[in-house]
Amino acid sequence: MEYDYIIIGAGSAGNVLAARLTEDADVTVLLLEAGGPDYRLDFRTQMPAALAFPLQGKRYNWAYETDPEPHMNNRRMECGRGKGLGGSSLINGMCYIRGNAMDFDHWASLSGLEDWSYLDCLPYFRKAETRDIGPNDFHGGEGPVSVTTPKIGNNPLFHAMVAAGVQAGYPRTDDLNGYQQEGFGPMDRTVTPKGRRASTARGYLDQARPRNNLTIITHALTDRILFEGKRATGVRYLKGDAGTGQTAYARREVLLCGGAIASPQILQRSGIGPAELLQRLDIPLVQALPGVGENLQDHLEMYLQYSCKQPVSLYPALLWFNQPKIGIEWLFNGTGVGASNQFEAGGFIRSRDAFTWPNIQYHFLPVAINYNGSNAVKEHGFQAHVGSMRSPSRGRIQVKSKDPRQHPSILFNYMSSEQDWHEFRDAIRITREIIAQPALDPYRGREISPGANVQNDDELDAFIREHAETAYHPSCSCKMGDDKMAVVDGQGRVHGVQGLRVVDASIMSQIITGNLNATTIMIAEKIADRIRGCQPLAKSNAAYFIAGDTPARTSPVRHSLPVTSYP
């Protein structure tokens, strides 16, 4: 089999490339996906409120685990990644957050990445998006990704938590993806007008499937990329449960879109990576690139949980006897509790004035439960997910063998910097100040987690080590740039070889301030134009907020109550 392009991975980036490249009728594309179809009748992936279910099994989740994390009580920590058409957009939390403008301006300050400024990227965010309330300078109206905004009549806890953040002295913003990300406000979600998950399989692949120049093969596990000298010429993959070896050839390019965990694995198995590692595993060296699998970054977060004095939380939706009614309303009407991911409010703040742009993110949830659906509190409650955005900690990914079925060695090295500890302690204390504000007086009960007895630095640190979890945002493991640890250039082309690009979250040079999915889609849209030889979209001239000397917060309405005195 021979095609112009072979795309490895039908995820958030791969599906964008498949759709955009096949817009050119004279181009043939093979899309390889290790997982299966995105079954549209499977509520576990299609119902927004069921977002925890795919993380509990292995049909849609690679279910990686880290090596023992040395600063986290040597815990082996979850590292869920999507498997199936849609990739991680098939199992993520559907939060539509793009990052802060300053993230992209920081990228553009690095050598070789000058065209990755916020105003260069904004047109591609807009190109990808259809927002339900219409386009403006920041939002699109004709893109494949359906974005839904929170609606009047949603849970009162969302409004109370935003109001509490403002009363604590932080800004309010009406659009976390608009002029000013900093502050508290409503959170958009990647959900269709009919209440279905808006994965890239639904948004992009559905447009491309009817084209006869696109071939999609599922249950195709990539073994390695093939080379003639320094040129990528094809892909060796294993088909189906039997693992039958198959080979496909690329006339133009191989496009690796495996994500921040799989892409460095595939490069290393293919002979591109740290020379010493490949030599140890008897993998023939094609190109020594020491940065492959290095610079690994993620967001770590904690849950601060509270009981709710009024029966307005989503606790009843967790009870089995209420779930059939919720499911029926969602299935036939696309409305109700099932049609929302329930992350409809959040925010970004600077924990200290020294930060140039927000370093802490909040997701507010009107129920007390772990992200993966475990450890639900058996009473009315609510919680704040809070974590730092740009940790100095860096990890790595290394293959253990040539076998593509074997999971790699993953180490994020969470909380390895003193800055991490300062930020997480600040985050807990600031969250308690927010929860103590008058807006939450009608709802606030006791603090369930960490609990009123967790107060000093040592107690907070012990809680963080034992309870902080991944936000499922691995990135930066094949970073773009032109320094000695860069893996790709600003167009995703792998250094030192020809005919091979990496296009996914792994090529971010530094993790962004927020959830990764929207930015991963933007990256693929932008590089797709480069691959096709199209003129880049014109830079935006939209104004955007820069904090400058603006204080991180003003005086709160209520100075923090002692945790034990919460009414």
Curated annotation (Swiss-Prot):
Q: What is its EC number?
A: 1.1.99.1, 1.2.1.8
Reactions listed under catalytic activity: choline + A = betaine aldehyde + AH2; betaine aldehyde + NAD(+) + H2O = glycine betaine + NADH + 2 H(+)
> Where's the active site on this chain?
H473 (proton acceptor)
Originating species: Yersinia pestis (strain Pestoides F)
Q: Does the keyword Oxidoreductase apply?
A: yes
Q: Which UniProt keywords apply?
A: FAD, Flavoprotein, NAD, Oxidoreductase
The protein depicted here goes by the name Oxygen-dependent choline dehydrogenase
One Pfam family linked to the record:
GMC_oxred_C
Give the CC-aspect GO terms: membrane
What is the enzyme's class at the highest EC level?
oxidoreductase
Family, per entry: Belongs to the GMC oxidoreductase family.
Q: What does this protein do?
A: Involved in the biosynthesis of the osmoprotectant glycine betaine. Catalyzes the oxidation of choline to betaine aldehyde and betaine aldehyde to glycine betaine at the same rate.
- InterPro entries, alphabetized: BetA, FAD/NAD-bd_sf, GMC_OxRdtase, GMC_OxRdtase_N, GMC_OxRtase_C
Cofactors, names only:
FAD
Q: Which gene encodes it?
A: betA
Q: In which pathway does it act?
A: Amine and polyamine biosynthesis; betaine biosynthesis via choline pathway; betaine aldehyde from choline (cytochrome c reductase route): step 1/1
Under the heading SUPFAM superfamilies, the entry gives: FAD-linked reductases, C-terminal domain, FAD/NAD(P)-binding domain
Query: What biological processes does GO assign it?
Result: glycine betaine biosynthetic process from choline
